[in-house]
């Protein structure tokens, strides 16, 4: 029978493969491998190399007490034999556990009264070095026994390190005090004058400004990983207006406030200055609050003072001259216990330098005259009439019109941005809460998701951003961005309402604020990164109105007031500098990350 063509090809492939295997000589290789394996497996024990072992010195351990002991041997009677003793032991254990829980709770509360800054210094672990002094003050304030055991270090080496840490922080605070003496209101004459007038200077060429920002570089003196200004995730950042002795201040989620003297050297002697390896940033971290630090600012006419606000309901004043921390104000729920705080979400100063505005986590507004003394021994209960209802949910941030002292804009978790007139206060119309008062609302902007922040510049432009991944710019300078023919916002009457679209007139809450441009921007920070917030430069020396916002791709973006990008700074940025700000007058930028580290561009 003749073979088919397919069978012939198969036979030819078999023959070709056999010839190829013969050429490779695989049989001889397998035989050699087998012989080597057999020789190794049957080799004599003497031919194998023995492993050298080094005898470890025998350490005689001292006989320690057993971890578990019989209650009978210890002389402790059972509950059945002596129920009174058992009840007493149980009561002592419960009391000890309750006291421990109370101390942990007190650590998260605000500070009571005034302190020297050296008492609030923290170590590298974030614990207060003089925690006993602070906790005793808190315990005595609430009427408990003020006996807190001091933490004892297990090794003398740790004691020495603590002493070195105290000396170093004390030296840095002395530097802060020396810098505070150099500040005066006259040093910031131009900023003060410009903050009270509405500048109308034209912007420079866009290309020229971009080239200027191209020259900004990361601060070269230290590695950004070595500039740790806070122990935990940064929630607020402040650049002091000084241009000669620069100070950067940051606050974190646990109430720590870090002060970085940018231009100061950490070494005193010439020998130490010559050794670059020993040079470290001049940073002191203070425990000023018990919860998130929401805002840090400096009064216009008192550059030696720094105001800090927190979710623990307190506002404190840090004096760089006296090296003290004083409680300016504490807010608590109207009619509630003193320890139920009304968290402060933001603070701002108006044209009247003695009055500060603040908003709360519950959507309320409050103003306080700093000339009114705050008595820590008396409970500062707010009446409902003292608070103005602006939103029914958290106010993430607000801004005051720098050209007036009665117009404010608020951004809220309820997905709205609103502009208010504080001159006209009546019964609240748009709140679901009963018996509330609110100022007159000019208008409202509805967003798809929550609005994180809003800021107001000298030329009556507003910027806001939120979780809808948009940066919105509003123009109320009387221009023709939207051809709405609105007068400049400073001329609006106390009952003025911008016109609404016909399709929206039936809605109770108007939607009559319209941005003239929207910029796409990723604001999805997630759980471990602070919320992105855009901020205007308050008094730009170059006359160009600009704002800064962090970029989720580990950088900083700077735009002008028309929405044109001026810079994208990302040199050596290893994390998202979510909380950022510009120097009030100079084109220096700083941003803080979730690990407490700072990136400075100059």
Curated annotation (Swiss-Prot):
One of its GO terms (cellular component) is cytoplasm. GO terms for molecular function: DNA binding. Disulfide bonds: none annotated. Residues 48-58 have a biased composition (Basic residues). The keyword Magnesium does not apply. Residues 35-85 are annotated as: Disordered. WD repeats lie at residues 229-270, 291-328, 390-430, 446-484, 526-569, 571-602. The keyword Repeat applies. It comes from the Eukaryota. Keywords: DNA damage, DNA-binding, Repeat, WD repeat. It holds the Pfam family WD40. Residues 59-68 have a biased composition (Basic and acidic residues). InterPro entries: WD40/YVTN_repeat-like_dom_sf (IPR015943), WD40_repeat_CS (IPR019775), WD40_repeat_dom_sf (IPR036322), WD40_rpt (IPR001680), WD_repeat_DNA-damage-binding (IPR050853). One of its GO terms (biological process) is DNA damage response. DNA-binding protein that binds to both single- and double-stranded DNA. Binds preferentially to UV-damaged DNA. May be involved in DNA-metabolic processes. Belongs to the WD repeat DDB2/WDR76 family. This is DNA damage-binding protein CMR1.
């Amino acid at each position: 029978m003749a073979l088919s063509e397919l069978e012939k090809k198969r036979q030819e492939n078999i023959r070709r493969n056999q010839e190829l295997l013969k050429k490779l000589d695989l049989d001889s290789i397998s035989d050699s491998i087998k012989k080597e394996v057999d020789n190794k497996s049957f080799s004599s024990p003497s031919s194998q190399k023995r492993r050298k072992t080094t005898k470890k010195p025998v350490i005689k351990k001292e006989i320690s007490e057993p971890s578990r002991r019989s209650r009978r041997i210890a002389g402790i009677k059972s509950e059945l034999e002596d129920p009174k003793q058992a009840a007493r032991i149980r009561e002592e254990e419960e009391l000890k556990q309750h006291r421990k829980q109370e101390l942990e709770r007190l650590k998260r509360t605000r500070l009571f009264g005034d302190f020297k800054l050296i008492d609030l210094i923290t170590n590298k672990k974030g614990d207060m070095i003089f925690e006993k002094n602070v906790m005793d003050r808190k315990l005595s304030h609430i009427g408990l026994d003020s006996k807190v055991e001091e933490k004892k270090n297990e090794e003398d080496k740790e004691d020495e390190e603590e002493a070195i840490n105290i000396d170093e922080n004390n030296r840095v605070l002395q530097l802060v005090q020396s810098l505070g003496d150099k500040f005066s209101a006259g040093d910031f004459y131009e900023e003060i004058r410009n903050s009270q007038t509405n500048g109308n200077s034209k912007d420079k060429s866009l290309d020229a400004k971009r080239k200027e920002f191209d020259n900004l570089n990361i601060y070269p003196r230290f590695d950004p990983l070595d500039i740790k200004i806070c122990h935990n995730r940064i929630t607020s950042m402040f650049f002091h207006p000084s241009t000669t002795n620069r100070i950067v201040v940051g606050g974190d989620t646990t109430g720590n406030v870090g002060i970085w003297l940018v231009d100061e050297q950490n070494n005193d002697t010439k020998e130490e200055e010559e050794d670059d390896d020993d040079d470290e940033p001049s940073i002191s971290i203070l425990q000023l609050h018990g919860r998130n630090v929401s805002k840090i600012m400096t009064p216009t006419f008192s550059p030696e003072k720094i105001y800090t606000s927190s979710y623990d309901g307190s506002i404190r004043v840090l004096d760089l001259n006296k090296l003290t921390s004083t409680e300016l104000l504490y807010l608590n729920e109207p009619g509630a216990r003193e320890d139920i705080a009304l968290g402060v979400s933001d603070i701002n100063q108006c044209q009247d330098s003695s009055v500060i505005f603040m908003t709360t986590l519950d959507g309320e507004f409050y103003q306080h005259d700093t000339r009114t003394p705050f008595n820590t021994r008396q409970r500062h209960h707010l009446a409902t009439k003292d608070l103005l209802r602006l939103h029914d949910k958290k106010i993430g941030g607000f801004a005051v019109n720098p050209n007036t002292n009665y117009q404010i804009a608020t951004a809220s978790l309820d997905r709205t941005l609103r502009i208010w007139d504080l001159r006209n206060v009546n019964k609240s119309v748009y709140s679901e809460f009963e018996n509330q008062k609110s100022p007159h609302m000019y208008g409202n902007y509805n967003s798809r998701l929550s609005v994180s922040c809003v800021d107001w510049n000298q030329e009556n432009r507003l910027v806001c951003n939120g979780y809808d991944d948009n940066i919105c710019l509003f123009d109320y300078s009387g221009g023709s961005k939207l051809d709405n023919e609105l007068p400049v916002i400073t001329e609006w009457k106390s009952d003025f309402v911008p016109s609404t679209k016909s399709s929206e007139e039936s809605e109770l809450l108007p939607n009559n604020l319209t941005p003239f441009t929207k910029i796409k921007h990723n604001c999805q920070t997630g759980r471990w990164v602070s919320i992105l917030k855009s901020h205007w430069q308050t008094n730009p020396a170059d006359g160009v109105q600009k704002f800064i916002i962090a970029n989720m791709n580990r950088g900083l973006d700077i735009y002008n007031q028309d929405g044109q990008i001026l810079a994208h700074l990302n040199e050596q940025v290893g994390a998202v500098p979510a909380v950022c700000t510009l120097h009030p007058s100079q084109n220096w930028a700083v941003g803080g990350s979730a690990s407490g580290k700072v990136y400075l561009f100059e």
